[in-house]
């Protein structure tokens, strides 16, 4: 399923959705689809044993790729709220959602600290 905002059709993520989550999801999908192409072009561009012309062409192709195909564009976001700050990567939750879910007992192996 696609929408008007993105140049390529994308699937919608499950759960909470806002514009930032849609953008991040689109970038993740495009990075996943083009990862092999980008890695091969980087290998060619950085291989000193190859001819200079071939390396230069690979570098120009890399520079021509859109920004949304780069891994640096991907941001860790909370799957419950969409927050991008203080996301615990093991649970993919922001600190507030982590606290709420831990207190409810929704996270296995996590309990309130007592000392």
From Swiss-Prot:
Q: Which family does it belong to?
A: Belongs to the universal ribosomal protein uS14 family.
Keyword Iron belongs to the record = no
The UniProt gene name for this protein comes to MRP2
Q: Which UniProt keywords apply?
A: Mitochondrion, Ribonucleoprotein, Ribosomal protein
GO aspect biological process, one term: translation
Q: Where in the cell is it found?
A: Mitochondrion
Q: Which Pfam families match?
A: Ribosomal_S14 (PF00253)
The family database entries (Gene3D superfamilies) matched by this protein are listed as: 1.10.287.1480
Tell me, in a sentence or two, what this protein's role is: Component of the mitochondrial ribosome (mitoribosome), a dedicated translation machinery responsible for the synthesis of mitochondrial genome-encoded proteins, including at least some of the essential transmembrane subunits of the mitochondrial respiratory chain. The mitoribosomes are attached to the mitochondrial inner membrane and translation products are cotranslationally integrated into the membrane.
Give TM regions. Answer: none
> What PANTHER family does its record include?
30S RIBOSOMAL PROTEIN S14, SMALL RIBOSOMAL SUBUNIT PROTEIN US14M
Q: What is its main location?
A: mitochondrion
* Protein name from the UniProt record: Small ribosomal subunit protein uS14m
Organism, per UniProt? Saccharomyces cerevisiae (strain ATCC 204508 / S288c) (Baker's yeast)
Give the intrachain disulfide bonds: none
GO cellular component assignments: mitochondrial inner membrane; mitochondrial small ribosomal subunit; mitochondrion
Give the multimer and partner information.
Component of the mitochondrial small ribosomal subunit (mt-SSU). Mature yeast 74S mitochondrial ribosomes consist of a small (37S) and a large (54S) subunit. The 37S small subunit contains a 15S ribosomal RNA (15S mt-rRNA) and 34 different proteins. The 54S large subunit contains a 21S rRNA (21S mt-rRNA) and 46 different proteins.
GO MF term list: structural constituent of ribosome
